[in-house]
Regions:
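Contiguous, structured surface segment used for ligand recognition
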Residues: 56
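Small-residue-enriched flexible segments
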Residues: 1-50, 59-62, 67-366, 371-378, ...
Length: 427
């Protein structure tokens, strides 16, 4: 599989940005190492362009008639190789060359048909969709692997998704032009599409993993046989006798949750919290939304069950950097061959200024979905998060967005990044 053409641009006028993007992908499509006949486009726009979503899709699809399938969404920020766009009008595009029988675009009005055997799926969703968590779990069950990746659209204006399949519109969507609001959409992939995906956490535990002994709905009343509020105050070393200090610390604290089945029986802290002191990829970070002093209970923004593991945590930039570098290194080590020809070694060893995507990395393209609360500003500077990805993963075609919640496996995460790469093995 050859490298996927990709591009990104910013401009106050969407037509100018689209023109810049089209020029970039067309220039790549004539290069030997890049795919020349892609049929699937992944399109992400910032919310500055949300009101023009239909016009953007119509224009790009008319300019790229050979690309018959489109998927994507809107974000308060978008990402590409080595760059992030926040609070400015921008778009990014990647063109994927995959066997036509190995992927299907779907949406709420044109769901995935029974005739396609999905192995995994890229999912975009609207956070306002009723029973969203259940829909994500149901979609995961539709795949052989049970693995989804993607995120929730994030926007300060219109929350839109792109989904166009086949020669024009998806069969069944009627007069809809490929821009949707609400529900789920995305791309399902067959088993011959090589994908490697990892979740990177952004929070650091500040307590051991506790066992939830008693809980009702989103209220936990007992941890390890003790009142949950007492455990929280002890772990954070604060007291309600000094309410201002206690509330300030608690507001900066979140909880990491793991279900018993995912925690291998919940027998050990090392399951939810690894030997490095970081959360495992199955831990879901949620907000503390209230305290109940009368019942000595803690309320969180998710449903709780007895037997779950719960650890208190806080956002930590250094831990987030280290974990992001770790997942990039894991993917790189898994895909790069042990022996490379001299030409490839020279290309991969090029300086950052001279670097360019190369097939020898084993990566045809990548999708990165990060939390809208992460990104460069959180990591210390403009585009800092994507610069970390480039240094650790290498120079690869990449697009993505900053989401209102990240999807991996059958879960909805927060404060994480989900990095997925298309391997360049032949389908």
């Amino acid at each position: 599989m050859k490298l996927f053409p990709y591009a990104h641009a910013t401009h106050p006028q969407w037509r100018m940005a689209a023109g810049l993007v089209l020029a970039q992908v067309r220039a790549q499509m004539v290069l030997h190492d890049y795919a020349s006949a892609p049929t699937l486009a992944l399109l992400y726009i910032t919310d500055h362009y949300a009101q023009e979503a239909q016009a953007i899709l119509d224009h790009l699809s008319a300019e790229l008639p050979e690309v018959t399938d489109w998927a994507g969404t809107v974000g308060v920020g978008i990402a590409s190789n080595n760059v992030e766009y926040f609070d400015e009008p921008a778009l990014t595009l990647m063109l994927c060359e995959l066997p036509s029988d190995q992927y299907r675009v779907f949406s709420g009005v044109a769901p995935l048909g029974l005739g396609f055997e999905a192995h995994t799926a890229l999912v975009h969703a609207d956070a306002s969709t009723p029973e969203l968590a259940g829909l994500i779990e149901e979609m995961a069950l539709r795949t052989d692997s049970g693995y989804l990746f993607g995120g929730l659209a994030s926007s300060r204006s219109s929350t839109v998704q792109f989904a166009v399949g086949g020669n024009g519109n998806i069969k069944g969507q009627g007069a809809a032009g490929g821009v949707f609001r609400g529900g789920l959409s995305g791309v399902a992939f067959g088993e011959r599409v090589g994908l490697v995906s990892r979740v990177t956490q952004g929070c650091l535990p500040v307590s051991k993993a506790h066992r939830v002994d008693a809980a009702r709905n989103n209220l936990v009343t007992e941890l390890d046989g003790e009142p949950a509020l007492d455990v929280l105050l002890r772990d954070l070393k604060v007291s309600l006798d000094q309410p201002e200090q206690a509330l300030r610390t608690i507001r900066a604290t979140l909880v990491g949750l793991m279900r018993v089945a995912e925690a291998d029986g919940g027998a050990s802290d090392a399951v939810a919290i690894g030997r490095s002191g970081n959360f495992g990829s199955d831990v879901l970070v949620r907000h503390i939304i209230g305290l109940d002093p009368a019942r000595r209970a803690v309320a969180v923004s998710d449903q709780l069950e007895a037997g779950m593991q719960l650890a208190f945590c806080q956002r930590n930039v250094q831990a987030a950097k280290a974990d992001l570098m770790r997942v990039c290194a894991e993917i790189r080590e898994e895909l790069e061959p042990e022996e490379l020809p001299a030409e490839a070694l020279t290309a991969l060893a090029a300086s950052e200024a001279e670097a360019a995507p190369h097939p020898a990395r084993g990566i045809a393209g990548a999708i990165y979905v990060s939390c809208s609360g992460r990104g460069g500003p959180h990591f210390g500077g403009a585009s800092a998060e994507m610069q970390i990805v480039r240094r650790a993963l290498g120079d690869v075609p990449l697009v993505g967005f900053f989401a209102g919640g990240e999807i991996a496996r059958n879960h909805l995460y927060g404060y994480t990044g989900v990095l997925t790469v298309f391997t360049s093995q032949d389908c």
